[in-house]
Amino acid sequence: MLNINFVNEESSTNQGLIVFIDEQLKLNNNLIALDQQHYELISKTIQNKLQFSGNYGQITVVPSVIKSCAVKYLIIVGLGNVEKLTEAKIEELGGKILQHATCAKIATIGLKIINRINRFTSPTFTSLIASGAFLASYRFHKYKTTLKEVEKFAVESIEILTDNNSEAMKLFEVKKLIAEAVFFTRDISNEPSNIKTPQVYAERIVEILEPLGVNIDVIGEHDIKNLGMGALLGVGQGSQNESKLVVMEYKGGSRDDSTLALVGKGVIFDTGGISLKPSSNMHLMRYDMAGSAAVVGTIIALASQKVPVNVVGVVGLVENMQSGNAQRPGDVVVTMSGQTAEVLNTDAEGRLVLADTVWYVQEKFNPKCVIDVATLTGAITVALGSTYAGCFSNNDELADKLIKAGEAVNEKLWRMPLHDDYDAMINSDIADIANIGNVPGAAGSCTAAHFIKRFIKDGVDWAHLDIAGVANSNNASALCPKGAVGYGVRLLEKFIKEYN
């Protein structure tokens, strides 16, 4: 794991040294001294604008010309227009620096920032750089018996000197706790589905959350049936692995504080059931439980920081499989709410799981607000791609705060519409509700959201985050390698701490 240390004096042993330069390409007094020490290597680099122009995110790794010095490379980083820097952009710079250092095989890196950079103090700026680098250091190699040369190398340490190291370390320690929660979310999402059965997943939740003081209740199929959760059980009835409902109660606030409920879709693997998915890319359905992972990760982040709030998380863990006992298209199930649902398509299963879980959390905990997170529809990916997740809500203020929280951590949300016309599309001829709309291919993410909305009680603020397009990525980003992103943990943590 990457070690990040805030030190009181510059080390003479670091192989790489980070240098920040904005689009003005002007060197301050500290950089002038460093430039002279390295025979004007920095100024010569920035004079060649084809090599380095100071644009945001531009990074040039330049070999040092001093043979007797431990510093083998200068990592010259463009800040662009410093007036436009945000916390999210600075974090991304940290991730990009780590990636470039990894490619150049620079094992140890030094960074010295003792002045403000625009509105950011040196502790704030450096803690964000450190956070981005730490997030980008994540790897999932546990099932590889041999690693390629490019996979073997990892940056060992970053040493940072600021004008207030204790403050910088304090800021970074909080960000590190959040990043470790993101790592759990990525880990459990990347885990193969034959390993993370509902039982194993539930055990891992208990293992990580109980030591943090979170009350955990793992409910098996017998008790789920007694609760009347016919929709959730119907999804999992084709699997040999028993479905689970996991309830996580974090009581960080006072008894008088209201409870916020987080609900996550935990479809461990989704074949589509009898409405079979195409075989191409079906292996990616290991990520169909990413909504539940985001909920668990958020609880980890809150509990590890001892945030003074009351939050309950509920995740329904099921497998949507084929067998002689699998749910059939046309089946009717009775949900916990008493409403009946016609299952017109067994591949629209996530909303069935959520219908029972959101009802359960309202019945048991009487929350003021419910936020559900799910890789719910391919339609949201068609609409928004992998840039935004969809946000549906019955409360404008709630939606606005979630969107602001997402902007702050670069986990972006786009507000999607709710409308009576969409609600009418999910009326069933033989039951109270159908699990898909009656117009093929039309408004799929909107009708799915309305299905969940039918199970939200009057007076409860509700938001539905459809993360199907952002939960995993086929390409590495500044903060994450290819695979599970861990989307939602930082967004929800930010929302709960600062906007709730």
From Swiss-Prot:
Offer a single GO CC term for the protein.
cytoplasm
**What GO biological process terms does the UniProt entry carry, in alphabetical order?**
proteolysis
Q: Which cofactor names does the annotation list?
A: Mn(2+)
Q: Which Gene3D superfamilies match?
A: Leucine Aminopeptidase, subunit E, domain 1, Zn peptidases
The answer to whether UniProt assigns keyword Protease to this entry is yes
Q: Which reaction does it catalyse?
A: Release of an N-terminal amino acid, Xaa-|-Yaa-, in which Xaa is preferably Leu, but may be other amino acids including Pro although not Arg or Lys, and Yaa may be Pro. Amino acid amides and methyl esters are also readily hydrolyzed, but rates on arylamides are exceedingly low; Release of an N-terminal amino acid, preferentially leucine, but not glutamic or aspartic acids
Query: Which family is this protein grouped under?
Result: Belongs to the peptidase M17 family.
Q: What does this protein do?
A: Presumably involved in the processing and regular turnover of intracellular proteins. Catalyzes the removal of unsubstituted N-terminal amino acids from various peptides.
Q: What is this protein called?
A: Cytosol aminopeptidase
User: From which source organism is this entry?
Assistant: Rickettsia prowazekii (strain Madrid E)
Its gene name is pepA
